[in-house]
Design a protein with these regions (language model features):
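Short active-site neighborhood of thiol/selenol oxidoreductases, capturing the structured segment around
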Residues: 14, 29-55
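N-terminal targeting/trafficking signals and adjacent low-complexity tails
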Residues: 24, 36, 107-108
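Mid-length scaffold segments of soluble, non-membrane domains
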Residues: 53, 58-86, 91-93
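Thioredoxin-like thiol-disulfide oxidoreductase module
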Residues: 88-118
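A short, hydrophobic beta-strand/beta-hairpin element that forms part of a small beta-sheet core
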Residues: 119-134
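Non-catalytic, surface beta->alpha helical segment in thiol-disulfide oxidoreductase systems
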Residues: 131-152
Length: 153
């Protein structure tokens, strides 16, 4: 559960009580060990909507976009994002580019994304459990900026 939170029109920030439990759930979900001493970035796909099902991006431009996101994020956090969906529809365009995981029992949605925001959203969680989320269309620059600001916490 969350014991401190601030909600704004574009995001949500606070602290999760037990990050180790979240780390364990994410490790099980992804079949990869989540290092509790590192920052976590989750990109959340709410399901197909007008925003995330339109646009002119090709598979190649999406691949380049996500490779750049992951490369620079790794320099900041030594981790890569975890891609989680509520509804799988709309993630097919990333087949062969990203590995999406189903939100276990809607945990990620209930902790960080209580409402459906168009496009996709993200959350950055520090090693101490402090987090900042951003609702709606994501930019690499915002993810990097949030990761840098929480890296020191």
């Amino acid at each position: 559960s969350i014991h401190h939170q601030i909600l704004s029109s574009t995001g949500y920030q606070g602290t999760i009580e037990n990050k180790k439990v979240l780390d364990s759930i994410l490790s099980s979900l992804t079949n990869k060990k989540i290092d509790s001493s590192k920052t976590i970035v989750i990109i959340f796909h709410p399901g197909k909507d007008e925003c995330n099902s339109s646009g002119s991006a090709t598979a190649e431009t999406r691949k380049i976009w996500f490779e750049e996101l992951e490369r620079k994020l790794f320099k900041i956090t030594q981790t890569k994002p975890i891609y989680i969906y509520k509804e799988k529809e709309g993630t097919e365009k990333d087949d062969g580019i990203l590995t999406w995981h189903k939100d276990p029992n809607r945990l990620i949605e209930s902790l960080f994304f209580k409402y459906h925001y168009p496009c996709s959203s993200f959350v950055v969680i520090s090693k101490t459990g402090e987090f900042k989320s951003y609702f709606g269309e994501i930019t690499k620059e915002y993810i990097w900026s949030y990761a840098k600001s929480l890296q020191k916490k």
